[in-house]
């Protein structure tokens, strides 16, 4: 009777109290679940000190131990940063941080001559202050991750000056995009009438497509140097492979990722008949950063930021041989182009937009509920931006967790399909060796807890991918 009496008493609380309590309870439930999973994986890092028999042919004990220690350090960092983030978020909610920041934004606006009727301007000030707070509180964690953990394990290639310039530039670019887009979205919601959710969804769709279109050409070059892949065998073979599957390739770039880190990557971008491929220089074993003269001849300007530490960066990269041979790079690209050929990119866009439409529709249903605002300290006003924050971040959090897990499962399926596509191109053997090299270069730990990997891994564990490719090689 005592337990049921407590449950009945809980329902006697006002609706806003129940909403607030449910949000906090769910947040901590997710945090404890994530911590439980992380501790399961951490136990694997601690106890698996020898190379498993099935890995002896592909990984030496030295690399295995390095990856184990690297992942242990990352696990420790993740625990403390996650705990801080959860406690900080709880304190912000308990002590009315959101309404306080909204009032502070209003005071700034009042001092500039803008009254309460200028809600959109107040919303932009709120966003600026909120993102500034987030950047400042996250800075120590980012510094520790970069200059302690990544540095310790040989991945960091940045100086402190380069890091800070980069952080400031990212913040400025983010504000230049976030503030005008947010202002237009809020305006559309306010004037859109009963069907504002349709107009808001269409607006965000257009914005996302524009950002995807301009990112690699206008935004990414603000932070990294992109150089056309030199004429040669690799470029020729990439073009031949692209043509064989009707991929409308227009350009191939190499990005100087080694200026920041030893981690490697490759991707493609662009719409319709204007596709481009980007390779990280850390992915290419047979590639060196062009000197200044070569850059000028190719028409590409070198970055000004961090030029003083270029030699230091190059020295670090040369001291650590990494990357893939041309045949392996082609296999990796065969996998990436498989995502395009199999329609994975389009499917992800469709899923994203269906989710976006559903969220805006539900937002339209819930935005008039005063108890949602009251739950977070807004008793006398219902600002649109605050409504977006409350509903999208807090009320939708259970749905977001379920959706995230489903997308993770789908992503793993897509990865297997892309590997199979590379196999059909005759790249199984080279992709097999490339995956081993990339895992070694990035110090990925090849042993994982099944529950942790099921919940978190957007890519299948290395052993599962290798087994599938091994069967393909035998075929």
Curated annotation (Swiss-Prot):
Xref: Gene3D superfamilies: Metalloproteases ('zincins'), catalytic domain
One MF term in the entry's GO annotations: endopeptidase activity
Residues exposed to the Lumenal side: 1-18, 103-123, 192-195, 369-382
Ranges where the record places region Disordered: 293-314
Activity regulation behaviour: Inhibited by HIV protease inhibitors, such as lopinavir, tipranavir and nelfinavir, leading to defects in lamin A/LMNA maturation and accumulation of prelamin-A/C precursors in cells. This causes defects in nuclear envelope integrity and release of DNA in the cytosol, activating the AIM2 inflammasome.
Pfam family, one: Peptidase_M48
InterPro entries assigned to the protein according to its UniProt record, in alphabetical order: CAXX_Prtase_1, Peptidase_M48, Peptidase_M48_N
Co-factor: note: Binds 1 zinc ion per subunit.
Residues involved in Zn(2+) binding: 335, 339, 415
GO biological process: adult walking behavior; bone mineralization; CAAX-box protein processing; calcium ion import into sarcoplasmic reticulum; CAMKK-AMPK signaling cascade; cardiac conduction; cardiac muscle cell development; cardiac ventricle development
EC number: 3.4.24.84
Nuclear domain ranges by topology: 40-81, 145-170, 217-347, 406-475
Feature: compositional bias, Basic and acidic residues: 300-314
Descriptive protein name: CAAX prenyl protease 1 homolog
Gene this chain is encoded by: Zmpste24
């Amino acid at each position: 009777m005592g337990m049921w009496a407590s449950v009945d008493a809980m329902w006697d609380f006002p609706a806003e109290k129940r909403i607030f309590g449910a949000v906090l309870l769910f947040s901590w439930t997710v945090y404890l679940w994530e911590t439980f999973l992380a501790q399961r994986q951490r136990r694997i890092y601690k106890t698996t000190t020898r190379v498993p028999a099935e890995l002896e042919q592909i990984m030496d004990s030295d690399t295995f131990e390095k990856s184990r220690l690297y992942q242990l350090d990352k696990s420790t960092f993740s625990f403390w940063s996650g705990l801080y983030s959860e406690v900080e978020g709880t304190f912000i909610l308990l002590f009315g941080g959101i309404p306080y920041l909204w009032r502070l934004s209003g005071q700034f606006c009042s001092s500039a001559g803008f009254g309460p009727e200028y809600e959109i301007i107040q919303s932009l000030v709120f966003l600026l202050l909120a993102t500034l707070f987030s950047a400042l509180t996250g800075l120590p964690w980012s510094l520790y991750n970069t200059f302690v953990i990544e540095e310790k394990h040989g991945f960091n290639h940045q100086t402190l000056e380069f890091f800070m310039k980069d952080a400031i530039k990212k913040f400025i670019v983010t504000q230049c995009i976030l503030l005008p887009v947010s202002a237009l979205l809020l305006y559309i919601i306010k004037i859109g009438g009963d069907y504002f959710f349709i107009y808001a969804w269409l607006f965000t769709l257009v914005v996302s497509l524009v950002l995807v279109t301009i990112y690699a050409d206008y935004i990414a070059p603000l932070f990294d140097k992109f150089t056309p892949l030199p004429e040669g065998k690799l470029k020729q073979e990439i073009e031949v492979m692209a043509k064989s599957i009707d991929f409308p390739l227009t350009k191939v770039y190499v990005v100087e990722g080694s200026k920041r880190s030893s981690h490697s990557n490759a991707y493609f971008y662009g719409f319709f008949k204007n596709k481009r491929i980007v390779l990280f220089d850390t992915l290419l074993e047979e590639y060196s950063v062009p000197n200044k003269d070569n850059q000028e001849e190719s028409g590409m300007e070198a970055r000004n930021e961090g030029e003083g530490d270029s030699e230091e960066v190059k020295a670090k990269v040369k001291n650590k041989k990494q990357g893939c041979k041309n045949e392996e790079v082609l296999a990796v690209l065969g996998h990436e182009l498989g995502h395009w050929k199999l329609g994975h990119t389009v499917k992800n866009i469709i899923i994203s937009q269906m989710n976006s439409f559903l969220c805006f529709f539900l937002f339209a249903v819930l935005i008039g509920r005063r108890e949602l605002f009251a739950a977070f300290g807004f008793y006398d006003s219902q600002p649109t931006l605050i409504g977006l924050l409350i509903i999208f971040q807090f009320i939708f959090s259970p749905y977001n967790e379920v959706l995230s897990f489903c997308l993770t499962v789908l992503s793993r399926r897509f990865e297997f399909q892309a590997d199979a596509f590379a196999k059909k191109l005759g790249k199984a053997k080279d992709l097999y060796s490339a995956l081993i090299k990339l895992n070694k270069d990035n110090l990925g730990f090849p042993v994982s807890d099944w529950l942790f990997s099921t919940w978190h891994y957007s890519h299948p564990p290395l052993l599962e991918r290798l087994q599938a490719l091994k069967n393909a090689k035998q075929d």
